[in-house]
């Protein structure tokens, strides 16, 4: 007989009828007993790959501790229920050991085009994604993508559990690690801004160089070009569109500089710090520069 059969996939499927055998499946997605079943814990990493960690550190020219910290930043961070240990993405982790390089291994196995279409369809505020709050019923829902894209994005592995309010049964979500966050935000850029997929990585590089050298004129000229050729459909959601583009740009710049980004009542406040310069910016729709300085 079969003692334990394990089925895994991306999103949940519905129970087709009251007579279906599939109705007897036990969903273990958020069960504490199984939180480590699909990944690698920090303890397992050090107990089984300690020699490889030292070799990886030597290849990268890093100390052992810094290498471990960077691995955790890039590939750790998955939590499948509240108050659970962090889990490494095994595919990315093992490829990093294989090539001894920090790459976007899992992200490059598939493109989240469908998820981006969901976000745009529902006019989703991208800044909210980093601190979305919801309950277990929504996270485990099957067809809620028709009104809410978050369950599908969570089930696909682009968001994970970051915190839990036990009193209200509310989960706080966020990106699990840098590989997923940077990869997903980079993927979003051509879908929201006036830039093609080939040029996108170079545009981010130019943004960073311009703020680091104090060339703010070129920086803002490049930023304005991202809003060119905005379609009529987008104009109807103009304020949200501008906020989303600015969020993407400064989130990407923030991977290489220090950025504090806040939104409030149609206004965006930003502090951007490099080694030589500190920029304080305020963006306001349908307002003048003088009004923003008040």
Predicted regions and their residues:
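Phosphate-binding site recognition
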Residues: 1-238
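Coil-to-beta-strand transition motifs
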Residues: 2-3, 152, 265, 276-278
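Metal-dependent nuclease catalytic cores in nucleic-acid-processing enzymes
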Residues: 151-159, 247-251, 255, 294
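Acidic-basic catalytic patches of nuclease active cores, encompassing PD-(D/E)XK
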Residues: 225-258
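Conserved catalytic cores of phosphodiester-cleaving nucleases, focusing on short active-site segments
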Residues: 246, 270-285
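Catalytic centers of nucleases
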Residues: 257-276
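Catalytic cores of nucleic-acid endonucleases
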Residues: 285-294
